[in-house]
Each structure stands twice: as C-alpha cells, then as structure tokens.
C-alpha cells in the first residue's frame, strides 16, 4: 500500500516574473492584485516515512529561495497530467534512491499558485476578498499550465491522484464492411478526419484495397502508423511527385533535380540521401575519448588518443508546425530531433555544433510597433498613395497559434535550452521577419520557419549501416513513451488551421535533453570501440515515433520484425496500443544489436543510467508484427499490427501535381523623396538586420572545446560573424566551417532568383573561412512552400530547377542533404471573414566545408585608425557582384517603406561567385585582409555599420564610385572623371547604392597594399566591380560622402543603439529588465576599451614541464554525473598538463567499480547533472551527502593531505553544496539563479586574486578573458557562507580592470564580482567560468594575436592545469 505526503518547497517565481504574470492576469480580471507561486512536492512511499526519513526528504527537497508566508486567495495547483511520470520525477526519484531512501516510490513536483483579488470598499469592511468566478478561474488556469503535460486541480490533496494507475485503453478497429466498397471508404474517411491522419484520396483507396486483400479490418494502430510513415513529412510525396506545369509534362521530379547535383559532383561526399544525415569527407584527426579495456587498477576507463580518418556529418531540420503551436517545446524538440539525426547516422556518431534559424511575421513589439507593420497593399505604387490615408491594421492571427513575438520570446529559449543541456554549442544561424500584403494576399510567416542544423563527426569505418541477420535484437534506447506528439508527422504536413485545435496541440512533442545526453553517452561508448562497435544499425525516433523508426530500421536491411508492445518502455499508464506504438515522445533511438553483443551494450546503458528495452527481433519474413502480450494469444486484439512491410512502406500511389504559373504585375521600388536619415535608421531597426544578441547569449557556444569562431566578434563581442568554425580535434588547426544563406522575400517577386541568392549568400558567408576550393563545399537545402496555393507549386518547381539543374552544376557543388515543409500557410476565420497568410517559396541553404587552418578565419571587425587625428592607414573596398544594378525588390528598404518591387538581386553568372570565392581565399592566404563582411540584408549600409560596430569606431564612406553610369565604370577602384559620368538623380542613386542587397562583400585592407589587392581582384576578373569606398575614422561618426559633400553623419553609438533596439526590447520582455537595460546602456560608453587582457606571467612558460619529464603521471578522476557534458575537454586539458585522466561516473562509485582513494585528485565537470532537478548541482551533491558510503568516501578524500580537487560550473555548484565536508570551505556560498534570470553564455574578463589556491599560483593580478555558460552562477551568501571570510580566487572585472557587478560584464550579478572561491589551504577550488574550454588560444572568440603564437598555442588558462601538475611534484 502506498503512503502519500506533500512537502511544500521554495518560491517558484522570482519577483520580476511574478510581476510579469500579474500583469497578464490583470488583463483577464483587473481586480486581481497579487499572485504568488510555491513548489509542492508529492511523495509516494512504499512504507510510512520515519521521522528521520521525513527529515531527510525535507532536506532533499529544500532548494532555491524560501517561500513567503501563505496568503489568502484562489488556489491553483498545477501538476503533471494524471497517469504520467514527468522527467522531473524520474530524476528526483533517482536522486532519492541514491540518498538511502529506497522506500521512495516516486516524487512529483507541482506549483501552487495563489491569486488574490482586491478587497474593495465593502469587502474591505467585512474583511473578505472577491473570489474568482468559474469562467475567470478557467481563463487564469489556462495561463498557468501547459495543457499537453499538465493539469490544474483545486487542492493539494487532489495531487495524490498523480500516483493512480489508469486502466489501459482498448485497441480499436475500423470496420470497412464486408462487401460494400463505398461504405468501407466512408468508414476510412471518417477515421481520417477523427484521427487527423491527413491521408489523401488515393491513399484511402490504396488502404481499402490492401485490407480487402488481407481479408480483415485495419486497427487504429495500423492506420496511425501508416499515416505517419507515409505523411508528406516523412515520405516527401511532393518532392517525389510527377509534375505537369501549364499543361506541359516535366521530365524530372523535384528530388531528381536535387539528386542531379550529387550525380554531377559526388566528390567529397561519403553518404548522401540514404541516412539520417549526410557525410562529407573529413581528414585524419586525433579522436579523444575513454578507452575500454584500460580499466586496470582503477576499474574505470582511461582517456586516450586514436588517430583516425574522421568524416563530418551534416544535417538541417525544420520544426515549423510544433513551433507555431507551442514555441518552447516546438523549438526544443526540433533541436533535439536534429541532434538525434546526427548521432543516429551510420552505426553511431557524435554531434558537435549547431545552427538555428527563425523566420516569423511582424513582431508588433509593445510600445514599438513600426510604421511598416500593417496590411497596406505593397503592390500599389508608392506614387499613387495618398499621404493622408490610414493604413489598414495588422491582419491578426488565429487563436490556436502563437504570435510571432511569442515565438521569438519562447522558441529560441526552447532551442537553446535543449542544446545547452544536451551539451552542443550553437554557433550560428539567422533571424528574419517578413510580412507584407502583396496585391491582397498577405505574405508572411504566421506558420514560422524554425530550423535546426549542425555538424558532427563519425569514424570512417562507421558511416554505413550493417545488415541485420534474422534474430538481431531490436532495442529502444532513451526516454520513455508517453502520450505526446500524437500524429505529429501528419499534422506538420497540413496547412496550419486545417486541423482541430486539440489535434494540433496533441502533435507537439516535449523534450528532456538530459535523457538524450545519457543515450548519446551510450552511443559514444559504442563507436569508441571501433571495429567492436555493437551497433549494427541505428535510427532516431522522430515523426511517427517507434512505429516509424523500427520499421525503417528493419526495412533498410530487407527484413521484417516481430515486436512485443508491452516491452516498450513507458512512463504513462492508460495508453491505448496506438498511443504506445505511435506517440512521438522524444530522446529515443532504435538500435539493432547482435545477441552476442547485448551483455556489453547492457553494461554501457546501466553505467550511463540510460533506459533501454529489447522490444523485438528481426525476422527473415518481411512481415511486421506487433503483438500485445497482455491480450490472449487467440484474441483478435493480440495483433495490433500484422501486415506485410510492402503495404506499410511499399509503393502507395505516386502523387501527380498538375499546376500552373501565375504572373503578377508589380511596381518597381520608388525611392523618390525618401529621407536618408529616416531610412538609414529604419533599416538598422528592422529585426532582420538588427542585432541578434538576444538569440545568442542564451546559448552555450563553447561546450566541447572545439569551437573557434562563434557569432560574437572582437573585444566588444558584437554578434556579426559570417561563419561558424570548429576544429577537428584539440591538437591541430584543421576544422570545419558552416553557415547559412536565405533571401526568402525575393520569392514573392522572383522565386528562382531567391533560390540562387540563398546559395550565393551562403557562399559569400563561408568565404570568410579558409577553404581549399569551392568544390569542397556541401549544401543542405531546406525547402518551404505553401503548396496548393495558386502559383506556388510552379514557383517551387522553377526554384528547385534553377538550383538543382543550373546554378549548383555550374558551381560544381552538390546538395547531399535537405528537407521540405510544404504546408506553409495559415488559414482561419475571423468573425466570419476568411483570412490566410501565405509564406513565399523559402529556400534555406546551409553550407559546410573543411577548413585548412581555423586561425585564418576572417571577421567583420574593422581595425581602427592608429590613433586619433592620424590619417587613415587602411582602406575599405566593396566587391559588387551586382555590377552596379542596385536592384531593390524584396529589400529591407522596400519593406520599411511598404513597397515590394519588381526587380530583385540575382546571380547573373555562376562564374562570378567562383571568381569571388577564389579571390577572397587568395587574399586571405596572402595575409592582405584585415576584415571581411558579406553584403546581405540592409545592403552596403548595414554591412559597413556592422563592421564599425564590431570595431568600435567611426567610418567614412564615399559612394561616388557606386553612383556612376554602369556603362562607363572604371576597372579600377579610384574615381576618374566621375562628375562627367554621373547620370540620374544623385540622391536616388545614393539610396540604391546603399540599400541594394546584391551579392558581394566589403573588405578592409592596408592602404599600402591596395594596389596589390586590386591586382588579385583583376586577376580574377573582379576589378571592374570593386571600388574603394572609404576608411575608418577617429571621430566615432558614421559618415556618407557624395560629390565631396557629407550627406549623412551620425554617431556610431546612436546607430548601434538603433541596431540593438529590437534585441533589447525582446530580451526585456523575457529576462530581468534591469539587466537588459544595463547591457543596452553600456553602448553609451564611447571610451569602452573592450576586453583588455593583462598577464603577470610568461604565457610560453610550462611550469609542469620538469615534472612531466620525470615520466610520472598522477591519476586524475574526471568526475561526472548523469547530465554532465564538459568532461571530454577537461580530460584533455588535464592530460596535456601531465595527468592520466580517467572517466569516473558517479555510478562507478556507487557500484564500487572504483574509489576516490585510487586518485590523486578529481575534477567535477560542468553540465546539467540530473537536469538541475533539486537545484543546479544540488541533486548531485545530495546523492553524496545523504549516501553513507559516498559521504564517507568523499570526506576521506578531502581530508587527505595530498589530494586536490577542482569544481567547474555544475561541478562548482555541486562542490559548494559539499562545503560542510570540505575542510576550509565553511565560508563558501551556494551558487543560485543569475540575476538576469537567464542562461548566460559569454566571454568575460576575470582578475586572478591573491589567494591560497594552488590552481592560480603565479597568476595573481592577471586579467584574462574566459567563457561562462550557466544559468545559476550567482554567489549567494544568504543561505550559506560568509562573504567577509571567503577566500576568493577570481573576480569579474570590467574592461578597465575594475571589479564589477555591472551586467553583463558580471554575467550573474555575484557580489564583489566573485567568480571563484577556494579553501584556506588552496587544494580545493571551485569556479563558475570554464577554463577547460579555452585552454588553447584558438578556442576563444577573441584573443590578442600574440597569444596564438606563444609557445604551443596554449591560452593563459593552461597555466591552471599545469599548476595542478606542479603541485603533485
């Protein structure tokens, strides 16, 4: 018999989030005047808790800020849905069991909200308060919970229903009738609508015929499985369709035209189209991982090297539909699914770094709605508009989807949170806002684009899956099944608004990244075995759940399979067979394992605490059988699925698209009378051009230690990088580059041009990285369109043809991977008026290439004049691949002036791009380029401004050479008789030159090398379109000159604040507004010197060298708990310093496989132990403190005279909670939520204090940049420690070297800038920043140039690890 209890916990909302929620609730009922929230913990135990056990549980569940006294009001208890076990509960229960509480059956968490109304005069006299009526309660409740995973109950006692086991729902059959085909078809049509299957008429006929031949009725399981496996999302029916356009049969499908690129340029591609990700050729790399069989005396594997041919994975996915419905989980699971695709390639691989992109409709920011954010018809010529006309208001949106602003507040956090917790850096991406009324059709992205992509690495020997002998075990690895994401594949294939609201919401998955981390650790352990890898084949579980993944796994090997439904790992009771088999619960993989290898695989899973289950086995007969072990063997319910594989995955009817092209007459962009001052600022404020900082600092960009170029550039950390770059390993400088290109608004005017420009932009972006040749470039193409809307199908076909049959073949590059999402329109009814928003054909290109030397990557940071008043010593040159056409159609200028245009930028000649790429590579190799930035959204104006922002300087631009008559343009960069060559109106030509978004780039070169640069450009045929346009200035002004007159001048600070405005506003709606204001105001500091390192020691000195020379290598335990993700780079740094590094999981200590006594020291690594359940690092610490064996072992270790330990980030949080058993740590604080209430990923500066720490010996007084990546780094002395007595090792300092609490220089608000503390004897030190991620200079997004050349290229932080080795003697 279970025994239930409820333990109240900490505050669930910070003060500013409480105030924000109150503002929302006041819009429901203005009389609501207070809201509070407190965590509740519901505990189910197998036996009554003793007083000691209850006290232990209370201590376990004490974390965060104490709750205030209860207040009166309406109570709302939000808890997980009955019958489910939440991810939080799984981790908390596991922690409890590790804390010597075996009788705990389960711990669940809820939140009790108390909503209080005003007393009012009469109620004030009687002492009473207004109670909410039922309608208001329902409206309030809707804002307090996620109805997919949570419910609202009225009392705490009702929460005990969480532990009820619900009865399983029955299998259903669809009766097709005995002989009446029409009746059978009608029954299937009804099921199609009821279940949201999205089956076409042809598919319904196919299924009726197939089941008549099988002589039985289909089950709901089979229908749901078929619908997911054959959805547009999974089978890409439109891309494989036959086409007729304007009555003319087309000879190729869309997919055939994409494949054409690979057929013509297969070189360098290892895997294309046949797996979860594409694979391009890499190179020899030093792979670094724990080696099985090296356990020796320690019982755990030692880290080591293996030189191996290592290839690069490429994958880019979209998750548009879920993000429209529920932005945080939609984007989170989009990122998670793409990561799984990489890990499930071949026979197992390792994800490495990510990209993220968003496209939405107008944001309509509160108190900052822009003049162009309305429904004015842009097809009306500007000259015909009456200035007094009032523009129609915004088009609105359906209730069932999130607003664009909500998507951009919640979606990026969802995607970043998954990447952060899983442990993959996100290094690049894009953000576009587009919405315009064009001739009565609203074009935009109410159904957003949410794109997640990335790269990974795979051993050359693991790139292809193996065959599956009959009897091969079919295993589910990872998270449990729950009723989540039902019908997601089918739902995402429908236009938003054509499904029911409940089915739309059902189709959104929810994420648990810590679980996926555990599963990935198992995959890593498998591929690390090389030829002994037990994985024969692997697939990720995505659309359709295991009902799609398991059949794909066996179909690829020409096998059938038999599964037992009751062996599927679940954490929800009451599921029907269809819900068990078809749900899209995340963090799952399906694997094929040979029976003989299973014991070893099982041991790996148990060590990582990764759930797994053997669900079935492969069969020779190609029949798919799913049996229900709970049903009698002779009952019809015993076989929820029993069908030939070729019925499920064979050849359902091939789609035929019969479409037509639709011509449209649009006016050209009219710039007559436009005010340059206004337009310049409006363009910078447009979200597409504006700073993306709010999307970037929320993400971890350094985990793994292999990144060298992220979005942030220079000592002022401005987000303007063109390309993301990683290294292949921790030793060399070869690596990979990736970037994105997209120009979707152009498709409204000329869809094929938009496709060509997307590829062109990807090339001009990636050109910033040193790449041997353009032929090494590989592209991913993600295609979006509103198929079915008149003219859009033909536009899609023409765009794919332009890319796949023309441009890519001409460039000699291929597209080995991609995805499509072809239901990009939103329909709804607004008070009887039918409305819709139709997205343009949208090609998002991601480009990938091997990099020869990551140190040569170019950035947009301008190098300023040598000193104030001196003549400019550098020159800016624009390379204009538009050859002076200055086409404005679809540009940001057109959008902010509410125009569309009829002529767009285009790639006129593929040879231009090839010559451009070759010229930039040659100039870079010769060391002639100081800065580089491609021209894109916002045109030359935005390009130059961003370069100045990154350089923290002014710039003077002369547009004379850009306003010439194109027929008389010089082939050299100097003006010659320009006054005689000018034609047309000068002001108009200036606007076109500044704001046209033609392909090209601006380069900064030493003035002394200008002639040599032009010689190279002339060699590549580019001199005629290359022009000297100016230079940095010392005035801090951004100036535009024409005809020897200054036509525009504004302070860089003013323009940079305009450019940052959108980011600041969105961050202020999401994070602590005091912090976001502080960051915004930092732009006012004109004299800010930027990051300013100062070293008090010799960077080239290796203090560990004499001790390494003895040959002694002390053992260092690289300690991790489930969810930790920074152990690999830490192990490398320790190994480089002269230690033997061993991989020690807490499960190893619990199982007795090893003991801390076997090691000289340990490092507790960063990440998200237990997903930060029970507080960051606290769950990890409590499994030690409340477990007698572990507490004794750790206490003994700390009390040894020769031991040392380091805690970093999550390890710092954990060790701070161990302070009671660490000698000399009594004054240590806890580390709690950042003052910004946000995860902070930044490069900041710390000062090394004089302290006893052995890790900082000889570094005192140094100011050194270091990365932070945490959400809970605030040194909190309110519950523990003594700020007056604590020994501080590091403090955050500002760019002038002063200790600071100013955000974001102090990223968490810690008092007195505390970033690290140590014990009185200095042997045990903890710090929140990550030195292990920047032990090489090249790992920093910015560092002084001389650091990379010093010694072995180590950064100053390598001294920490070498100090530890020196301490060991």
Swiss-Prot record:
What keywords appear on the UniProt entry? ATP-binding, Cytoplasm, Glutamine amidotransferase, Ligase, Magnesium, Metal-binding, Nucleotide-binding, Purine biosynthesis
**Binding, ATP:** 330-341, 721, 936
Q: Where is this region: Disordered?
A: 321-352, 373-400
Q: Name one GO cellular component term.
A: cytoplasm
Q: Identify the metabolic or biological route this protein is part of.
A: Purine metabolism; IMP biosynthesis via de novo pathway; 5-amino-1-(5-phospho-D-ribosyl)imidazole from N(2)-formyl-N(1)-(5-phospho-D-ribosyl)glycinamide: step 1/2
SMART domains per the record?
GATase_5 (SM01211)
Q: Is Ligase among the key words of this record?
A: yes
Active site (UniProt): 1209 (nucleophile), 1330, 1332
Q: What does this protein's UniProt record list under function?
A: Phosphoribosylformylglycinamidine synthase involved in the purines biosynthetic pathway. Catalyzes the ATP-dependent conversion of formylglycinamide ribonucleotide (FGAR) and glutamine to yield formylglycinamidine ribonucleotide (FGAM) and glutamate.
Name under which the protein is recorded: Phosphoribosylformylglycinamidine synthase
């Amino acid at each position: 018999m279970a025994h239930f209890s409820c333990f109240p916990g900490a505050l669930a909302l910070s003060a500013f989030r409480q105030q924000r929620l109150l503002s929302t609730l006041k819009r429901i009922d203005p009389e609501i005047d207070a809201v509070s929230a407190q965590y509740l913990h519901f505990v189910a135990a197998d036996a009554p808790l003793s007083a000691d056990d209850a006290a232990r549980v209370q201590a376990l569940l004490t974390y965060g800020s104490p709750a205030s006294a209860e207040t009166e009001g309406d109570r709302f208890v939000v808890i997980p849905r009955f019958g489910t076990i939440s991810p939080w509960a799984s981790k908390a229960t596991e922690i409890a069991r590790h804390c010597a509480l075996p009788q705990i059956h389960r711990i669940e968490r809820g939140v009790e909200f108390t909503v209080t109304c005003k007393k009012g005069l009469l109620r004030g006299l009687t002492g009473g308060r207004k109670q909410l009526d039922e309608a208001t309660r329902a409206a309030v409740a809707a804002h307090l919970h996620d109805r997919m995973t949570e419910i609202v109950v009225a009392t705490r006692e009702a929460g005990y229903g969480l532990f009820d086991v619900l009865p399983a729902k029955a299998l259903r059959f669809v009766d097709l009738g005995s002989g009446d085909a029409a009746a059978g078809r009608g029954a299937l049509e009804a099921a199609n609508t009821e279940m949201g299957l999205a089956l076409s008429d042809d598919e319904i006929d196919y299924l009726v015929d197939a089941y008549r031949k099988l002589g039985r009725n289909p089950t709901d399981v089979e229908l749901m499985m078929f619908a997911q496996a054959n959805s547009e999302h999974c089978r890409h029916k439109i891309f494989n369709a036959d086409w007729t356009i304007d009555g003319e049969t087309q000879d190729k499908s869309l997919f055939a035209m994409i494949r054409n690129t690979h057929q013509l340029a297969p070189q360098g591609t290892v895997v294309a189209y046949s797996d979860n990700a594409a694979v391009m050729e890499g190179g020899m790399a030093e792979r670094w991982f724990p080696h099985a069989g090296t356990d020796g005396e320690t019982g755990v594997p030692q880290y080591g090297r293996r030189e191996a041919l290592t290839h690069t994975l490429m994958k880019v996915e979209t998750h548009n539909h879920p993000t429209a419905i529920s932005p945080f989980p939609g984007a989170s699971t989009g990122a998670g699914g793409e990561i799984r695709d990489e890990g499930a390639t071949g026979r197992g691989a390792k994800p490495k770094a990510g990209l993220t992109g968003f496209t939405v409709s107008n944001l309509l920011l509160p108190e900052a709605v822009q003049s162009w954010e309305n429904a004015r018809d842009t097809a009306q010529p500007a000259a015909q508009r009456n200035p007094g006309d009032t523009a129609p208001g915004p088009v609105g949106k359906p209730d069932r989807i999130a607003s664009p602003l909500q998507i951009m507040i919640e979606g990026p956090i969802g995607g970043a949170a998954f990447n952060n917790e899983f442990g993959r850096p996100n290094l690049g991406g894009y953000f576009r806002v587009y919405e315009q009324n064009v001739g009565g059709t609203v074009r935009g992205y109410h159904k957003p684009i949410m794109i997640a992509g990335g790269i990974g690495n795979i051993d050359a020997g693991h790139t292809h899956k193996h065959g599956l002998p009959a009897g091969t075990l079919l295993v589910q690895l990872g998270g449990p099944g729950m009723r989540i994401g039902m019908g997601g594949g089918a739902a995402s294939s429908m236009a938003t608004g054509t499904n029911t609201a409940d089915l739309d919401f059902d189709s959104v998955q929810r994420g648990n990244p810590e679980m996926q981390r555990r599963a990935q650790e198992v995959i890593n352990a498998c591929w690390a075995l090389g030829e002994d890898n037990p994985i024969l084949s692997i697939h990720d579980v995505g659309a359709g759940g295991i009902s799609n993944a398991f059949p794909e796994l066996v179909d690829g090997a020409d096998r059938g399979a038999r599964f037992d439904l009751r062996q599927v790992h679940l954490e929800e009771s009451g599921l029907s067979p269809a819900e068990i088999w078809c749900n899209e619960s995340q963090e799952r993989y399906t694997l094929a394992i040979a029976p003989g290898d299973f014991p070893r695989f099982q041991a790996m899973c148990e060590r990582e605490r990764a759930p797994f289950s053997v669900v079935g086995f492969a069969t020779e007969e190609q029949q798919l059988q799913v049996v229900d072990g709970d049903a009698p063997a002779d009952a019809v319910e015993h076989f929820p699925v029993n069908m030939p594989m070729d019925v499920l995955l064979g050849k359902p009817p091939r789609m035929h698209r019969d479409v037509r092209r639709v011509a449209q007459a649009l006016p050209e962009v009219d710039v007559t009378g436009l005010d340059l001052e206004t337009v310049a600022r409006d363009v910078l404020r447009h979200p597409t051009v504006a700073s993306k900082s709010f999307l970037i600092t929320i993400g971890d960009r350094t985990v793994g230690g292999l990144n060298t170029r992220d979005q942030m550039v220079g000592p002022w950390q401005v987000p303007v990088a063109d390309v993301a770059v990683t290294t292949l390993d921790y030793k060399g400088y070869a690596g990979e580059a990736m970037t994105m290109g997209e120009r979707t608004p152009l498709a409204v005017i000329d869809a094929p041009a938009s496709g060509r420009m997307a590829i062109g932009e990807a090339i001009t972006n990636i050109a910033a990285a040193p790449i041997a040749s353009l032929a090494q470039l590989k592209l991913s193409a993600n295609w979006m369109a509103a198929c079915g809307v008149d003219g859009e199908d033909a536009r899609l076909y023409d765009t794919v043809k332009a890319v796949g049959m023309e441009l890519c073949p001409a460039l000699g590059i291929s597209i080995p991977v991609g995805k499509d999402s072809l239901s990009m329109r939103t329909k709804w009814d607004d008070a009887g008026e039918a409305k819709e928003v139709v997205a343009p054909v949208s090609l998002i290109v991601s480009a990938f290439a091997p990099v020869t030397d990551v140190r040569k990557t170019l950035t947009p940071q301008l190098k300023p004049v040598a000193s104030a008043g001196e003549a400019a010593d550098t020159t800016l040159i624009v390379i204009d691949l538009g050859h002076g056409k200055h086409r404005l159609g679809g540009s940001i200028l057109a959008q902010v002036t509410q125009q569309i245009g009829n002529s767009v930028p285009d790639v006129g000649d593929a040879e231009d791009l090839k010559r451009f790429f070759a010229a930039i590579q040659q100039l870079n190799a010769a060391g002639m380029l100081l800065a580089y930035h491609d021209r894109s959204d916002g045109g030359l104006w935005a390009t130059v401004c961003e370069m100045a922002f990154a350089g923290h300087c002014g710039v003077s631009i002369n547009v004379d050479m850009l306003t010439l008559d194109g027929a008389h343009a010089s082939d050299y960069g100097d003006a010659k008789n320009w006054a005689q060559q000018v034609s047309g109106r000068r002001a108009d030509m200036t606007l076109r030159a500044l704001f046209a978004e033609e392909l090209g780039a601006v380069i900064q070169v030493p003035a002394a090398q200008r002639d040599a640069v032009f010689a190279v450009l002339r060699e590549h045929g580019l001199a005629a379109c290359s022009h000297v346009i100016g230079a940095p200035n010392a005035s801090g002004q951004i100036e535009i000159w024409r005809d020897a007159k200054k036509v525009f001048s504004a302070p860089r600070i003013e323009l940079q604040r305009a450019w940052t405005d959108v980011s600041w506003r969105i961050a202020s709606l999401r994070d602590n507004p005091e912090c976001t204001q502080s960051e915004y105001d930092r732009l006012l500091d004109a004299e800010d010197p930027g990051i300013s390192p100062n070293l008090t020691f010799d960077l080239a000195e290796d203090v560990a060298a004499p001790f390494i020379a003895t040959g002694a290598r002390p053992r260092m335990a690289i300690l991790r708990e489930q969810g930790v993700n920074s152990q690999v780079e830490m192990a490398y740094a320790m190994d480089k310093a002269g230690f033997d590094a061993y991989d020690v999981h807490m499960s190893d200590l619990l199982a007795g496989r090893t003991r801390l006594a076997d090691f000289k020291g340990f490092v507790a690594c960063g990440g998200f132990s237990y997903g930060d359940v029970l507080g960051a690092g606290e769950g990890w610490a409590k499994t030690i403190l409340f477990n007698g064996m572990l507490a004794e072992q750790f206490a003994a270790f700390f009390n040894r005279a020769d031991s040392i330990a380091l805690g970093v980030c999550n390890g710092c949080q954990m060790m701070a909670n161990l302070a009671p058993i660490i000698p000399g740590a009594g004054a240590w604080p806890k580390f709690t939520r950042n003052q910004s209430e946000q995860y902070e990923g930044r490069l900041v500066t710390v000062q090394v204090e004089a302290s006893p720490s052995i890790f900082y010996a000889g570094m005192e007084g140094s100011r050194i940049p270091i990365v932070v990546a945490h959400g809970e780094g605030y040194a909190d002395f309110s519950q523990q420690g003594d700020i007056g007595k604590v020994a501080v090792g590091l403090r955050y300092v500002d760019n002038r070297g002063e200790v600071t609490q100013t955000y974001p220089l102090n990223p968490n608000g810690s008092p007195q800038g505390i970033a690290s503390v140590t014990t009185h004897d200095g042997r045990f030190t903890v710090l929140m920043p990550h030195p292990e991620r920047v032990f090489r200079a090249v790992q920093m997004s910015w560092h002084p140039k001389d650091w990379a050349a010093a010694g072995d290229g180590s950064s100053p932080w390598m001294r920490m690890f070498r100090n530890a080795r020196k301490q060991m003697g």
